Amino acid sequence: MSVKASGGSSVARPQLYQTLAVATITQAEQQDRFLGTGELNELATYFASGAKRLEIAQTLTENSEIIVSRAANRIFVGGSPMSFLEKPREAELAMATVAPGNVQEGMKLGTVTYVESRGGFLENLRSIFNSSPSGPTPPGFRPINVARYGPSNMAKSLRDLSWFLRYATYAIVAGDPNIIAVNTRGLREIIENACSGEPTIVALQEIKAASLSFFRQDAKATEIVSQYMDVLLTEFKAATPSNKLRQRPSGDQQGLQLPQIYFEAAERRPKFVMKPGLSASEKNEVIRAAYRQIFERDITRAYSLSVSDLESKVKNGDISMKEFVRRLAKSPLYQKQFYQPFINSRVIELAFRHILGRGPSSREEVQKYFSIISNGGLPALVDALVDSPEYSDYFGEETVPYLRGLGQEAQECRNWGPQQDLFNYSAPFRKVPQFITTFACLYDRPLPDQHPYGSGNDPLEIQFGAIFPKETRNPNTSPAPFSKDTRRILINQGPGINSQVSNPGARGEFPGSLGPKVFRLDQLPGTIGKKAAKGASIKFSESSTQAVIKAAYLQVFGRDVYEGQRLKVQEIKLENGQLSVREFIRALAKSDVFRKTYWTSLYVCKAIEYIHRRLLGRPTYGRQEINKYFDIAAKQGFYAVVDAIINSVEYSEAFGEDTVPYERYLTPSGVALRQLRVGSIREDVGGKVQKQETPLFVTLGTVTDTRTEPDIQFRINQGVSKQREQTKVFKQVANISDKAAVQTLISAAYRQIFERDVAPYIAKNEFSALESKLSNGEITVKEFIEGLGYSNLYIKEFYTPYPNTKVIELGTKHFLGRAPLDQVEIRKYNQILATQGIRAFIGALVSSAEYAEVFGEDTVPYRRYPTLPAANFPNTEKLYNQLTKQNDDLVVPSFKTVQPRLTLAGTSSSGRNGFTDLGRSSTSAQGQLGETANRCKPARIYRLSGTNQAETQLVINAIYSQVLDLFSSDIPANYRLNALEGKLQTGEISVREFVRELASSDIYCDRFYTPYPSAKVIEFLYRHLLGRAPATQEEISEYNKLMASRGLRAVVEAIVDSQEYARYFGEDVVPYPRSSSLGN
C-alpha cells in the first residue's frame, strides 16, 4: 500500500473547543430528544449573563497589557519585560511618519514606549497588609533575570502569558472552561523542559489578582472571573494526560494514538451503561440509546416499534446489554433493514458501524468476516463481532456501543473517507460497498488514466475535469488518490525525442510530418526586412494572412465562427502588422463568445482544462498545475487566467509571437480516438474486425438449376401453413364481468377439448357448475379445462372407444396442442393410464411444466405447430388434419422402433396375444369413476390462506379425504369433528394441528388402528400423513416400538412434528400423495 494513498477526500472539521450552547444542543441531538428543563434553565442563565460576560471580556481585553505587565513584573527582574511582548498587528493610519524600525533598534535608540503597571498606590498599600495578595507562592520560586533568560525566551514567555489571559476571556464568553482545559493542560511539562514551572504559577496568580482588581465593585463579575481563573490555575498545575491508544486486535491494523486534548475538544458523546440500580426512566434511556446505535434511529419514538421481551429481560437483569445488542442485530427487523437489501460486503460495513462503532480497518479484516458471513449468514457475523476481544475491551457487558469517530479515538488514513461516510445518517442508502472497493481498487492497482479531478476514466476527452457531484441517488463514488506529485501521461505530437519533459530545449521545435500543421505569420509589413527569429523555418510559414486568421479561430474556438462573432478590428490590425499573433490569440480568448462558450457554462476546473488545451496546446499535468490556475481564477477572475497562460514561459518558448497555438500533447485516450485504424485497434479498446465472408449454409443453399413456377409454389407451400399466423388465442382477462367474453372463452374450450361445439349434444346441463365457477372467478381456466377432461362425456368420447396409445395421442392433442414427442413420452403416459386411469393421465398433462409455461392459468389450449423435434411435425399435421370419428388409426407409430439385439425365439405369438388386454385399463366408464380412479388421481395441493369461507371448506374436505382415505368429496356426517372445524375456520389452529387431532381421534382408530396389525398401521400413517410409503424396514421398526410403548397418538405426533412433514407441508398445506406408486 502506498503511503501517499488515503481512503477518499471527505473534509473533516474537528471541533477545537466546547461552548455551553453547542455542547447542550449537541447532547440533546445525539439522544434524539428535546432539551430538558435543567438544560433550558442553564441556557437561559447563560444568555441572561451574556451582556455581563461580553463586558468582562471587553474590560480584560482593553487592560490586557496592564494585566500581563503586572504578571511579568512579578516574575522577571533586571529589565523591562514588556519590551519583549509582540503586539498584534493593527491597521495603520494613512499618514506620513518616520519608519520606526524594529523593536531591538528602538530599544537602542530609546524611542520605544511600553505600558507597565505595578498596581498603583492603593494596590501597593493593600500588598503591605496582605503578604500574598495574589495567592500562596510555591516553594522553590525565584525571580528570573531578564538578561540571563535571553530575548528569545523572554518573547516566548510574554507571548504565553498573553495567551493565558486570552484563553480565559474566550472561555468566559463561551460559557464553558473547555477552551482553557484544551489549551492549558499539559503545558507545565513543556515549560519545565525549558525553565522552572513555579514562575508560571506565580504569574497566573498575578493575572488572576490583576483581573479581579478591575471588578471590585461588581460581585457577579468577580465570581465569573474567579471561576475561570481558578480553572486556568488548576489545569496548568494538572499532570499531562496520557494519549488515547487505539486498540489493535490484529497485526494488519494501524496502531494509532490520539492526544488527550483532541478528545477533550471534540463533541461529548454520552456513554450509556445498563446498571441494576438505575431507575425505570434511566433504563429506558439506555434501551433507546441501543436502538439508536443498532437501527440508526429511535424506533420506539419514530415508528412505535420495540422488542418488548428483550427489553423486559435486559431491565430485569436476565440478560446483559451485550446479549441485548446481539439479539437486536439478529432480529427480523434488523435483517429487513440492513441485511436483505444489501450484498454481503455492504452488510459487513454496516454491522461494523452498528456493533463496533467503526468501519473495517483493512482488506484482511474484510476477507475474514466475509468468509464468516458467507458460511454462517448474518447470525454468524453478529456473533463474531459481539464475541470479539475488541468489543469486550471497548464496551464490556454493560455499555451500549457508540460511534468511535473523529475526536473519540485516532482515525486511520486508509479508510478515512469511507468511514466518515459510514457515520453519516445516509449510510444505509448507499448500496455499493466502499471499504472493500477502496482496499482492493485504490491501493492494489495503479492510478487510472484520468483527470486528477475527474470522477472516472476519460473514454471521451470531453469528460475531463468533472468535479465530484453531490450524489443523492445510488451513490457509488470511488475516489482515486491522486497526490500533488502525480503527473499525467501525455504523448507528444511529433518526434518522441522532442518531449519537453525529457528535452526542455526542444520545446520550440515544430512537429513536422508527425504532428499537426503549424501556421506562422512572418511576412507582414511590419516584419519585412527584420532578421528572422532563431529557429524560424520558411517551410512551416504561411504567407496568406487569412489562412492564419482562420487557423487561429479554429484553434481557439474549435470551430468556424459566425460573421457577426468575428473580431474585425483585431483582424485588420493583425494584417497591418500592428498586432502580433500572440496578442490576436489573447483578444480571441478574452472575447464574449469565448467566455460564454468555455467559461460561463462550465465548472471552473473544466473550463480551465478547456482553455489550457486551446491556448497552450496540451492538457494540464496534474493537481499542482491546475490548482495554480484555480487560485488565479478565484482571486482575479477569467481574464487573469487567460493572461497567465499566454504570458507563461512555456507559451513563449513553444509559439513565440508569430505562431498559432496547435495541439502539442494528447492523452492516451485522445491518441486512440484519433487513430482508430484497423491495425491500431487493441482488443481492449474496440471490437475485433472480422472479414466479411458468406456463411457456408448460404453457399450450400444456393440454387444452381432452373426451377419452374409450379415447382417454386410447391416448395413455398411446404412447412408450416398460414394457419399458425391466423390462430386466435383465447385468454381470460382480469375483468370477468364481461359475460359475453367469458361465454366465448367457454365455447373455445369446448371446441378444443371435444373438437366440436358441445351445446347441441348435451341433453343435461352437465357443465353448468363449471361454467358458473369460471364466470364467478372461483376457478381458473386451467381448472376448467381439467374439469372438462374429468367429465363423463370426455371419457365416453375419447377414452372408452380407443386403445391407450390412441388415448394418449388425443390427450396431448386436446390438452397440449401437439402430438406425442416420442416413444419415451408414450411409455410414460401409458404407464400412468394402465396403473392410475384416465383422470391421472389428464391431471399429469394439465399439471405438467410444459402446460404451465405455454398456457399458464388463464389460456385455453390451442394448436401450437411445433417444429422441433422434426419427426413430431408431420405427426401433429396428420393428427389435426384427420377427423376423430373417421378412423382409429394410430399416428404416433410412425416413429421407427429400435429392434433389440437379442430376441426370444421361444416366445410364441399366442403368448404375446395373451398379454394384449393386460395393458388396457378398464374400458368401463363407470369403473373409472369408482374407487380406484379417485384413489389414483393426480395430487392437488390445498393451502389454507383464510381468504374466504368456501376455500376453507375445500381445505377441510381435503383433510378428511387424505387422512381418513375417503374416495368422495361428500364427507359422512359421523366422520366430521365440528369443534375442530370451527377452530380452523376462526384461525385458532393450523392445518397441521387439525391433521394431528384427526389422526389421533377415535374415528381414525376405528378405521385404521383397531382392525389392523401394527406394521400395517404404520404404513397407513405414512401414506395419510406424509403422502408416501415407508422407505425402509427401519422406519417401520422405529415407529412400531414407539406405538407399543406409548400408543397411536405418540406416533402421530412424532410424524407430524418431523422435519419431513415441516419441509413438504408446513403449517397450512394439506398432506397429499407425493409418489405416483401410491395406492397400487
From Swiss-Prot:
Q: Report the PTM annotation.
A: Contains one covalently linked bilin chromophore. This protein autochromophorylates.
What is the membrane topology here?
Peripheral membrane protein
Q: Per the record, which residues fall in region Phycobilin-like loop?
A: 77-144
Q: InterPro entries from the xrefs?
A: Globin-like_sf (IPR009050), PBS_linker_dom (IPR001297), PBS_linker_sf (IPR038255), Phycobilisome_asu/bsu (IPR012128), Phycobilisome_asu/bsu_sf (IPR038719)
Q: What is its EC number?
A: 4.-.-.-
Q: Which domain of life is it from?
A: Bacteria
Domain PBS-linker as annotated: residue spans: 252-432, 514-693, 710-888, 922-1080
> Where is (2R,3E)-phycocyanobilin annotated to bind?
C195
Tell me, what is an example of a GO biological process annotation in this record?
photosynthesis
Where in this protein does the record put region Phycobilin-like 2? 145-237
Stored PROSITE patterns: PBS_LINKER
The record's region (Phycobilin-like 1) falls at 18-76
Task: Give, as one word, the top-level EC class.
Answer: lyase
Listed GO CC annotations: phycobilisome; plasma membrane-derived thylakoid membrane
- Keywords, in A-Z order: Antenna complex, Bile pigment, Chromophore, Electron transport, Lyase, Membrane, Photosynthesis, Phycobilisome, Repeat, Thylakoid, Transport
- Ranges in coiled-coil conformation: none
A GO molecular function annotation here is: lyase activity
Location(s) in or outside the cell:
Cellular thylakoid membrane
Main subcellular localization, coarse class? membrane
Q: Transmembrane stretches, by residue range?
A: none
Q: Where is this region: Disordered?
A: 906-930
Described purpose of this protein according to its UniProt entry: This protein is postulated to act both as terminal energy acceptor (by its phycobilin-like domains) and as a linker polypeptide (by its repeats and arms) that stabilizes the phycobilisome core architecture.
- Recorded family membership: Belongs to the phycobilisome linker protein family.
Describe, as the record does, how this protein assembles with itself and its partners: Phycobilisomes of this organism are composed of a two cylinder core, from which six rods radiate. The core is mainly composed of allophycocyanin alpha and beta chains, and of three minor components: the allophycocyanin alpha-B chain, a 18.3 kDa polypeptide, and the anchor polypeptide L-CM.
Q: What is this protein called?
A: Phycobiliprotein ApcE
Q: What is the lineage of its organism?
A: Bacteria, Bacillati, Cyanobacteriota, Cyanophyceae, Nostocales
The gene behind this protein is apcE
